[in-house]
A protein has these predicted regions:
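Extracytoplasmic/secreted envelope proteins and their assembly/folding machinery
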Residues: 55, 80, 84-87, 107-111, ...
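Short Fe-S-cluster ligation motifs
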Residues: 102-120
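Solvent-exposed loop/turn segments at secondary-structure junctions
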Residues: 71-74, 100-103, 129-130
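N-terminal targeting signals for export/organelle localization
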Residues: 1-44, 151
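Local sequence-structure signature of Cys/Sec-based thiol-disulfide redox active-site neighborhoods
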Residues: 55-92
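Non-catalytic, surface beta->alpha helical segment in thiol-disulfide oxidoreductase systems
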Residues: 123-151
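Extracytoplasmic/secreted cell-surface and envelope-processing proteins
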Residues: 75-77, 106-107, 131-134
Length: 151
């Protein structure tokens, strides 16, 4: 009887150890940072929304981060992978207005109203008002992007 209990305890201990190692491995693997190789790949880390939803967030006085850019912009192409890395490191939601979309005129007008002079533009909104933005645009470092995302 004692031998059977010892075998059961050993088996349970082994199962627990293997389970713990599997959980740790999966958690570590999940935290691997992927550096996107293209603008399109980088944009899989943002949530693309239409201008009407951005205006709704402003009207509802929400806190959010907004990226305005376009694939045809070489500066946006340089910035997008850094943004994707920062998003992965902070796990923040970043909304994306695509200035190459059908809403281009409306987005350009909105950007002008928000005092956005160039793309890429990453801005934080607090209670529906633009509070801060990256002044260096595509020249911003990953750490500077992270700082804006975590304010």
């Amino acid at each position: 009887m004692l031998l059977v209990n010892k075998k059961i305890l050993t088996l349970l201990f082994s199962i627990c150890t293997i389970s713990l190692l599997a959980i740790l491995y999966l958690n570590f693997k999940k935290r691997e940072i992927i550096i996107p190789g293209s603008y399109k790949e980088a944009m899989t880390y943002v949530k693309k929304i239409p201008l009407s939803e951005v205006q709704e967030k402003i009207n509802n006085k929400e806190d959010f981060i907004l990226f305005i850019g376009r694939e045809s912009c070489p500066y946006c192409q340089k910035f997008a992978p850094k943004l994707a890395v920062a998003i992965q490191k902070t796990n923040q939601t970043v909304y994306y207005l695509d200035n190459d979309s059908k809403e281009r005129k409306e987005i350009t007008s909105f950007a002008h109203d928000m005092n956005v002079k160039t793309v890429p533009n990453l801005s934080s909104f607090k209670k529906g008002s633009k509070e801060n933005y990256l002044t260096k645009g595509s020249k911003s470092s990953i750490d500077e992007i992270i700082e804006l995302l975590t304010q």
